[in-house]
Amino acid sequence: MQRFYFDTSVFGGAFDNEFEEATLQLFERVKLGKVICVFSDLSETELLNAPENVIKHFKNLPKENSERVLVTDEILTLATKYVTENVVGKTSFDDCVHIATATIYKVDILVSWNFKHIVNVYRIRGYNSINIRSNYQSLEIRSPKEIL
């Protein structure tokens, strides 16, 4: 079964007019057991400040079709490389942690609605260049709309 890393924006997308349809279709695939939703402890922390409906949606993920992963020192080191090599600025470090987490845990696709710092062809090239030079595999990064 495919494993998709969901960054925090995907959970909020379920309640955003622009992103709702594609996001809910993606969560339906999780519910039906077609996709494993991988999320990190960073996502959990970021969701603490989310609206109640987003938190409830996150907590209702089917446990059998979701996988919680931990941010490690290896992940933080890789995320730091993305910043020091100017793929994005320091203020986007948490986005880099999501990218590095998905890379280290070898998910099939990282899914995000963050078009500025994550789902951006130039940024993706930068992340993957660093991944390959650091002996990791390249990472497929897509919006929910692109994978339905």
Locate the predicted segments by residue:
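General small-molecule cofactor/ligand-binding pocket signal
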Residues: 38, 69, 140-142
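Residues at the C-termini of beta-strands that transition into short coil/loop
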Residues: 41, 72, 145
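Short, structured coil segments at secondary-structure junctions
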Residues: 64-65, 137
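Active-site neighborhoods of divalent-metal-dependent phosphate/nucleic-acid chemistry enzymes
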Residues: 68-126, 148
